């Protein structure tokens, strides 16, 4: 009997060890995001499509079947000349044709379904989709008889379509249609993760991005991007990391790679644990095709037992074409005196936002490469079209010259000498941000050497909810000699619907229809 009990207890303990090992393994999944340089010149539309498809298949093969999910970026595959239908769901793999399939499903989409099956991975791609119009009269039909959508399509490991999303917030896409109402797209995997997904410009607005996180509780998010970076607060990887941090979610962000047009930036981020993999092409005019891989925790707040990514501080010329924040002239700012061994405590206010700054710095030369300003801004910013965000921010940012208009410009002499730097040894920002039902407040940080955000070992962040405000403290954990941006960035999605700054003209612009708005701007 004693022997039996010993053997029984040994068997139980062995089983528990196996169970524990499996549970450790099952705490992660392997994700890949692709920074992709599209082929867009040098052939017919069909030839360009085939060249991009070949690039996609080559990248998928390079993963060697190790990934659980691969994400490709926005607008890097087909064009409005080589459209495809996209089914919402399919019971069977799209790899083989079924009798009731839409005849407008293009062969390239089937090739990708076959690749998903071959490599046993979930696959997210972005396509230009053709949707035949169901017209009841000539008045309801467009001249071309079909609509075009900017669409994400998701395949499971067998190549079946399990999710589709059509972009809601369009950005400089005159030939693309919107759906009648926004779509909220999710899918659940066999590794017990439910993903939400959207496209590029959507990330700056509440719907659908924040709907996924706040209304549905999604903690794993995918975004396909062709993002134009803007200094000092909205470069691609900087914004991706801040967004994942503020929402405490895992984010898989796949970006197009056209640095000559200001487009680059991909990464995998685990909430407030920072970047697990990331890439910004800043020192070249030609983009890359690269698969970034990371072991992603099922729980974004579960501590990761891997070394933090800290890129080397190697200064190289910045060739990435960058946009500039359009409202800098309206900031309330104060210029830091470029005096060696200085320290300052400063309180700056604008409208309902006051921020307290504590800064200590030293110079490694009497003529540093950048000047710096402390600034606060409450206002509304415009993007390239008649689309707006209400912003509250306060921070420190680099300026090419003495004027505030030079902030967010990269120095032309991008041979960053070691002795031309400003070293910040102490930096703290304390801000009280008015509470609103729908807003997102995130850390916005950027290093001039790498164009990446600061990692958790370099940044401390805390939030305290009070009666009418949220008190946020942001602090530099260690000295830093290559800061471009160190700021608290608040996006207030419903500012005017919730008793905001009271700009009546802006409120009216938000209420009238886009057609009338375009007419007014033309006038």
Swiss-Prot record:
Name of this protein: Vanin-like protein 3
Leader sequence segment: 1-19
Chain ranges of the CN hydrolase domain: 29-298
Organism: Drosophila melanogaster (Fruit fly)
Active site: 74 (proton acceptor), 167 (proton donor), 200 (nucleophile)
GO cellular component: plasma membrane; side of membrane
Induction entry: Induced by ethanol.
SUPFAM superfamilies referenced in this protein's UniProt entry, alphabetically: Carbon-nitrogen hydrolase
């Amino acid at each position: 009997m004693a022997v039996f009990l010993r053997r029984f207890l040994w068997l139980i303990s062995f089983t528990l060890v196996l169970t524990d090992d499996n549970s450790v393994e099952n705490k992660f999944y392997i994700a890949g995001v692709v920074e992709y340089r599209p082929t867009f010149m040098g052939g017919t539309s069909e030839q360009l499509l085939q060249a991009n498809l070949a690039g996609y298949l080559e990248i998928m093969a390079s993963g060697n079947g190790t990934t659980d999910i691969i994400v490709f970026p926005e607008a890097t595959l087909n064009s409005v000349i080589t459209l495809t239908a996209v089914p919402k769901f399919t019971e069977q793999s799209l790899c083989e044709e079924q009798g009731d399939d839409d005849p407008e499903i293009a062969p390239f989409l089937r090739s990708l379904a076959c690749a998903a099956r071959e490599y046993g991975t979930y696959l997210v791609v972005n396509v230009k989709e053709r949707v035949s119009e169901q017209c009841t009269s000539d008045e309801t039909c467009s001249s071309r008889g079909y609509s075009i959508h900017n669409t994400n399509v998701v395949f499971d490991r067998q190549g079946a379509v399990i999710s589709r999303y059509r972009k809601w917030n369009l950005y400089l896409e005159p030939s693309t249609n919107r759906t009648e109402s926004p779509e909220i797209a999710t899918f659940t995997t066999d590794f017990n993760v439910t993903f939400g997904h959207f496209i590029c410009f959507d990330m700056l607005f509440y719907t659908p991005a924040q709907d996924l996180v706040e209304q549905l509780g999604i903690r794993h998010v995918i975004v396909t991007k062709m993002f134009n970076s803007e200094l000092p607060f909205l470069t691609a990887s900087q914004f991706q990391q801040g967004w994942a941090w503020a929402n405490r979610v895992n984010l898989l962000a796949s970006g197009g790679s056209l640095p000559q047009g200001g487009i680059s930036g991909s990464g995998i981020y685990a909430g407030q644990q920072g970047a697990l993999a990331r890439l910004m092409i800043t020192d070249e005019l030609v983009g890359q095709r690269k698969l970034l891989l990371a072991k992603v925790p099922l729980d974004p707040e579960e501590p990761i037992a891997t070394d933090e990514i800290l890129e080397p501080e190697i200064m190289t010329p910045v060739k990435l074409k960058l946009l500039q924040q359009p409202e800098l002239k309206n900031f309330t700012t104060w210029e830091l005196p470029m005096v060696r061994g200085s320290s300052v405590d400063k309180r700056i206010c604008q409208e309902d936002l006051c921020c307290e700054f504590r800064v200590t710095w030293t110079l490694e030369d009497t003529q540093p490469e950048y000047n710096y300003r402390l600034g606060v801004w409450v206002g509304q910013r415009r993007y390239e079209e008649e689309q707006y965000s209400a912003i509250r921010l306060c921070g420190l940012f680099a300026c090419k010259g003495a004027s505030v208009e030079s902030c967010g410009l990269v120095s032309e002499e991008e041979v960053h000498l070691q002795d031309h730097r400003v070293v910040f040894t102490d930096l703290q920002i304390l801000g009280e941000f008015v509470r609103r039902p729908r807003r997102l407040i995130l850390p916005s940080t950027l290093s001039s050497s790498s164009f990446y955000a600061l990692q958790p070992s370099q940044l401390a962040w805390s939030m305290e909810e009070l009666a009418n405000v949220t008190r946020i403290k942001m602090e530099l954990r260690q000295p830093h000699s290559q800061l471009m941006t160190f700021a608290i960035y608040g996006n207030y999605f419903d500012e005017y619907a919730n008793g905001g700054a009271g700009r009546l003209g802006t409120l009216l612009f938000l209420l009238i229809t886009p057609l009338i708005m375009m007419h007014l701007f033309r006038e």
